[in-house]
């Protein structure tokens, strides 16, 4: 820098206040409240140590009076403003208001650019003028994929418009089918007309979703009788309902339909033989088994063998799924087995087509084969397929585009928005689309809507409350104190959900003790898990009802493990086995394990207890005996059904009732279909048989027990729908007597809390649009805390 040139020093390591010359008034051409600035004429006077700290092009010398305060002159004004008094003179005002004039004496060379040019790099940017043009809204990924789908698949544009414009269903009554011995009710004739018209429509089937107990089976049999030339028909039903289908077909058709039960080890393997029948009856378990053996094979000592499935190699005229929610999991082997059947007409019968979430409806729609809702569409080309085929797990087998470029119609247009927005905005539109579809493929009537046609008698529900005796009270308080201590330790460690199985066991033991102390005490002293022929559920510690096995070889009641699995929904905890705590892998629809019934009876709790004169009954059992004595009459026999979730409790009740002079029969999950049928027939036809003991896990659904009019539920459960279904076994078409349902509850026990929890969950069911039964079945951490605070 030339001698005599203007030197300004600027600190670069800290943030300083700046003054803009443009903001100074004409009188104040100097910076106010600043320290005396000493400006030196040449760079030789600058200390070497300061040169390292400051930049060479400008140097600021601070006042010795205040080393902690820096001041910077921000030279951002124009040269004209800066040289108002003199072209080469600058004025700075010090603390004493003295004007200091500084002259610059240097020649401007080519190498020495004016300050204004040097300031260009630090000059403030001018604000950009806002555009007055309105920007178009940003396209979301969902909208982008929708546009791409419409571009490559233009037929999708009018799917919902066509559904909305379809003519609404107008109820009409069909004529009574020839050959039926039972006269159909008016609403059932309307149902028959709808069934016939649906088979002739583009849907070739649908969902009959009448409420439980309104005669879905009878209406379906009427459809079979409408045209006897249209056969064969396949009916897939739960094991407990198999014989009921056979009996009702034989009873109401005068034997005009030829029936074959495809069940058991002696079932036929001849396709021509099956084609000669009008109706083939089978179970979901058998259908899944033959499908698995055909596609995946089965192991023997000599290797892996595959066996063709007779059911999957016959062209049926129609396939009917009873209790169709059994295929609600579209990824289950049972759903795959059903979807691979060959048929022209497809039907789903279910009083609860939606149990857990709306997505489960897709499995039924997929079985019904309703296009385009079941197809996967490519957003890059016109590829469309019902099957998800990506052999290399990356590229489509049909068009070679990647997975992310394919989407399912039902998922894209009907589920995504509901999952994201609920039933508001775009979610409400998707929800309305689902309702529009269901109006075209589903018929649902309730008992309240058709009360005049049904003519059902009133149903009364009461709760009988009793108290422990002194001995039971001491035992319960001891067990409760120990259980609460363990539960509190889980809460303190923050591992409640990780120990759901352990907490489930604690609750189960308290529930069992409220039934009878022996259910807990003898279980702790003599656990029969290794007894031959007996399968013990490792969740409820009772004889397993419909036992199924996990891949880690642990056995559970089908209902117990189902509720356990559902408890992990909507949280991030890993689903683990409740016994060994490794990742749980289990098929909830697999066939039940075979149980030796004779060994089962030998190992019942009665055979393990000393049932001599020293045996003591319980408060609850004696309360049941008292209620049954009240029903006895010399004029008529009033039949009753007793439900319990614990087969050991039913064993004790059976022994006590026989001692009291009551004739009983018992239905258990270990029975074969034939044994179940014989037991039900004996109860219905034998006047002397007064009490039917039923395991809630085995007989809660698909039973018609309208011969009884009294229902006793011994142990309450937190899912109220379980008890509602048990009541529907009696309060249904064919019932002409008032129905009374009595629920037993021991006060000052966990049962009182469960009753309160039931009421809370029942209110939630009636208050919500989407009845999410999975949420009802689950015990949340708040529910667990509620149960342990009695």
From Swiss-Prot:
Protein localization: Nucleus
InterPro entries per UniProt: Helicase_ATP-bd (IPR014001), Helicase_C-like (IPR001650), P-loop_NTPase (IPR027417), SNF2-like_sf (IPR038718), SNF2/RAD54-like_C (IPR049730), SNF2_N (IPR000330), SNF2_RAD54_helicase_TF (IPR050628), Znf_C3HC4_RING-type (IPR018957)
UniProt region (Disordered), positions on chain: 1-141
Biased composition (Polar residues): 31-48
DEAH box, short sequence motif: residues: 322-325
EC assignment: 3.6.4.-
Coiled coil: none
Location of Phosphoserine modifications: 25, 109
GO cellular component: Cul3-RING ubiquitin ligase complex; nucleotide-excision repair factor 4 complex; nucleus
Keyword Metal-binding included in the entry's annotation: yes
Family: Belongs to the SNF2/RAD54 helicase family.
Protein name, UniProt field: DNA repair protein RAD16
Protein species of origin: Saccharomyces cerevisiae (strain ATCC 204508 / S288c) (Baker's yeast)
């Amino acid at each position: 820098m030339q001698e005599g040139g203007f030197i300004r020093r600027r600190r670069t390591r800290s943030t300083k206040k700046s003054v803009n010359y443009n903001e100074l008034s004409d009188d104040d051409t100097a910076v106010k409240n600043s320290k005396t600035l000493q400006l030196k004429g040449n760079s030789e006077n600058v200390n070497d140590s300061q040169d390292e700290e400051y930049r060479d092009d400008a140097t600021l010398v601070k006042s010795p009076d205040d080393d902690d305060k820096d001041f910077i002159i921000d030279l951002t004004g124009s040269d004209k403003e800066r040289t108002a008094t003199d072209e080469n003179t600058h004025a700075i005002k010090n603390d004493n208001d003295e004007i200091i004039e500084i002259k610059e004496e240097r020649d401007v060379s080519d190498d020495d650019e004016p300050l204004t040019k040097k300031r260009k790099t630090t000059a403030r940017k001018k604000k950009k003028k806002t555009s007055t043009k309105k920007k178009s809204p940003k396209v979301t990924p969902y909208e982008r994929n929708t546009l791409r789908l419409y571009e490559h698949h233009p037929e999708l544009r009018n799917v919902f418009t066509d559904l909305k414009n379809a003519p609404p269903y107008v109820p009409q009554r069909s004529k009574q089918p020839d050959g039926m011995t039972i006269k159909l009710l008016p609403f059932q004739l309307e149902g028959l007309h709808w069934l016939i018209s649906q088979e002739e429509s583009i849907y070739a089937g649908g969902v009959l979703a009448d409420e439980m107990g309104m005669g879905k089976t009878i209406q379906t049999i009427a459809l079979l009788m409408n045209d006897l030339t249209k056969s064969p028909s396949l009916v897939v039903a739960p094991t407990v309902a198999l014989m009921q289908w056979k009996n009702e077909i034989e009873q109401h058709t005068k034997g005009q339909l030829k029936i074959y039960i495809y069940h058991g080890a002696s079932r036929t393997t001849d396709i021509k033989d099956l084609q000669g029948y009008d109706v083939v009856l089978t179970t979901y378990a058998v259908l899944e088994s033959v499908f698995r053996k055909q596609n995946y094979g089965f192991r023997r000592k000599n290797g892996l063998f595959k066996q063709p499935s007779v059911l999957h190699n016959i062209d049926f005229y129609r396939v009917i799924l009873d209790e169709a929610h059994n295929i609600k999991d579209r990824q289950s082997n049972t759903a795959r087995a059903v979807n691979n059947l060959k048929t022209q007409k497809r039907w789903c019968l279910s009083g609860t087509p939606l149990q857990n979430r709306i997505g489960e409806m897709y499995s039924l729609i997929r079985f019904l084969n309703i296009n385009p809702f079941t197809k996967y569409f490519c957003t890059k080309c016109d590829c469309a397929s019902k099957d998800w085929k990506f052999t290399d797990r990356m590229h489509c087998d049909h068009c070679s585009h990647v997975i992310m470029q394919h989407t399912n119609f039902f998922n894209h247009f009907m589920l995504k928005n509901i999952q994201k927005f609920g039933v508001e905005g775009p979610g409400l539109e998707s929800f309305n689309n689902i309702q529009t579809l269901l109006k075209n493929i589903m018929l649902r009537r309730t008992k309240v809507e058709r009360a005049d046609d049904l003519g059902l008698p009133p149903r009364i529900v009461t709760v009988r409350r009793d108290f422990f005796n002194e001995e039971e009270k001491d035992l319960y308080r001891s067990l409760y104190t120990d259980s609460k201590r363990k539960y509190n330790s889980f809460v303190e460690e923050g591992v409640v959900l990780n120990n759901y199985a352990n907490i489930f066991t604690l609750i189960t033991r308290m529930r069992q003790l409220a039934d009878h102390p022996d259910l807990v005490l003898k279980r702790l002293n003599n656990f029969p898990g290794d007894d031959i022929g007996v399968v013990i559920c490792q969740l409820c510690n009772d004889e397993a009802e419909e036992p199924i096995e996990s891949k880690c070889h642990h056995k559970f009641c089908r209902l117990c493990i189902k509720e356990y699995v559902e408890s992990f929904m909507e949280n991030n905890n890993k689903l683990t086995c409740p016994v060994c705590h490794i990742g749980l892998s289990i098929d909830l629809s697999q066939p039940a394990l075979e149980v030796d019934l004779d060994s089962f009876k030998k190992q019942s709790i009665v055979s393990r207890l000393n049932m001599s004169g020293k045996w003591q009954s319980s408060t609850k059992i004696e309360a049941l005996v008292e209620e049954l004595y009240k029903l006895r009459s010399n004029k008529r026999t009033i039949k009753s059904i007793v439900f319990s979730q614990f087969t050991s409790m039913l064993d004790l009740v059976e022994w006590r009732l026989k001692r009291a002079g009551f004739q009983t029969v018992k239905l258990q999950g270990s029975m074969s279909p034939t044994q179940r049928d014989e037991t039900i027939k004996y109860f219905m036809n034998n006047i002397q048989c007064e009490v039917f003991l039923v395991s809630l896990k085995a007989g809660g659904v698909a039973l018609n027990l309208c011969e009884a009019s009294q229902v006793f539920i011994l142990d309450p459960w937190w899912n109220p729908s379980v008890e509602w279904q048990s009541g529907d076994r009696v309060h249904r078409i064919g019932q002409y007597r008032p129905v009374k349902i009595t629920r037993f509850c021991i006060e000052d026990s966990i049962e009182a809390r469960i009753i309160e929890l039931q009421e809370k969950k029942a209110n939630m069911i009636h208050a919500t649009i989407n009845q999410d039964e999975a949420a009802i079945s689950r015990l949340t951490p708040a529910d667990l805390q509620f149960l342990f605070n009695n």
